[in-house]
């Protein structure tokens, strides 16, 4: 792995951005907790509890968890880890076969909402360096009720539009490509169904212009920060039924199945000695398999 000053500067810049984005997202989510109508969401507004962790083999991170009244469970985490891939992992990572040392920094979040009419969401962006370096990440929306799981539902239209704007600023071919990649990635083969309505997913993003690739990854984060609170405000005032809560709990089971069977981030974290509590914090707080 290159240890030149230029790469160190890039690592520091990426880490600083992910930590800044974490702070902005946590503030926005706490604001939503404050705004949630008390008749639907009794109790005190939630606040994030942050907990630092260290990775014995190098690096660490900060978990941010909130169990609120509107956000039933949300985790917003940052981590910066480094070390040496196992031979098994090195074979699967670009540039690691020649030199197994790696560096990875990023942000990840998953929000599970109290109200079944407010969709769950997942977002992550990351920067990874071996003898090569690249960005990856994306965001995807998971409505829990059937009528919301249609591409012509307003929330789906607006969610896709937000990421299209972020992509089109750089290349009009990126959004169709990364949207299709998201649909392919967040799919449960054993159920033959998508996890949600999609979004974008990208990986190994290295155009040769690091500053431009970094700017794109920042805009992906900003797009999330703009659109998801908008969708939450749109739906959080709607009352829900016991039947809708039941549908929500059953649909959450698909989330668990995907994360444990297919999710790259989960597997990467567990295979590189990541923080297990942080990795599995994506699990919903309550779920049913009928």
UniProtKB/Swiss-Prot annotation:
Catalytic activity: coproporphyrinogen III + O2 + 2 H(+) = protoporphyrinogen IX + 2 CO2 + 2 H2O
NCBIfam families: PRK05330.1
UniProt keyword Metal-binding, yes or no: yes
Top EC class, one word: oxidoreductase
InterPro entries xref list: Coprogen_oxidase_aer (IPR001260), Coprogen_oxidase_aer_sf (IPR036406), Coprogen_oxidase_CS (IPR018375)
Molecular function, one GO term: protein homodimerization activity
Positions with a binding annotation for a divalent metal cation: 112, 122, 160, 190
Protein name listed in UniProt: Oxygen-dependent coproporphyrinogen-III oxidase
Superkingdom, taxonomy of origin: Bacteria
Gene designation per UniProt: hemF
Quaternary structure (record): Homodimer.
Named cofactor requirement(s): a divalent metal cation
Active site, UniProt feature: 122
Family the UniProt entry places it in: Belongs to the aerobic coproporphyrinogen-III oxidase family.
Originating species: Caulobacter vibrioides (strain NA1000 / CB15N)
Binding site for substrate: 108, 124-126, 273-275
Matching Pfam families: Coprogen_oxidas
Coiled-coil intervals, chain numbering: none
């Amino acid at each position: 792995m290159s240890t030149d000053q230029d790469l160190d500067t890039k690592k520091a810049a990426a880490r600083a951005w992910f930590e800044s984005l974490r702070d902005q997202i946590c503030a926005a989510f706490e604001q939503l907790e404050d705004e949630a109508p008390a008749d639907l969401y009794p109790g005190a507004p939630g606040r994030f509890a942050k907990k630092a962790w260290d990775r014995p083999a190098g690096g660490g991170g900060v978990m941010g968890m909130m169990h609120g009244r509107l956000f039933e469970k949300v985790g917003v985490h940052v981590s910066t880890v480094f070390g040496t891939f196992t031979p098994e992992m090195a074979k699967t990572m670009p540039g690691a076969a020649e030199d197994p040392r790696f560096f990875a920094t990023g942000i990840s979040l998953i929000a599970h909402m109290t109200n079944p009419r407010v969709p769950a969401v997942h977002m992550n962006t990351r920067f990874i360096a071996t003898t090569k370096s690249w960005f990856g990440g994306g965001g995807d929306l998971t409505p829990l009720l059937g009528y919301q799981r249609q591409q012509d539902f307003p929330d789906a239209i607006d969610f896709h539009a937000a990421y299209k704007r972020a992509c089109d600023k750089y290349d009009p071919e990126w959004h169709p490509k990364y949207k299709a990649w998201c649909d392919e990635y967040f799919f449960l083969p054993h159920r033959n169904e998508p996890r949600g309505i999609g979004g974008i997913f990208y990986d190994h993003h290295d155009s040769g212009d690091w500053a431009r690739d970094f700017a794109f990854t920042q805009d992906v984060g900003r797009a999330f920060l703009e659109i998801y609170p908008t969708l939450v405000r749109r739906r959080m005032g709607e009352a829900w039924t016991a039947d809708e809560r039941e549908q929500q709990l059953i649909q959450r089971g698909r989330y668990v199945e995907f994360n444990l069977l297919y999710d790259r981030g989960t597997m990467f974290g567990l295979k590189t000695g990541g923080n297990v509590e942080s990795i599995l914090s994506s699990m919903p707080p309550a779920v049913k398999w009928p």
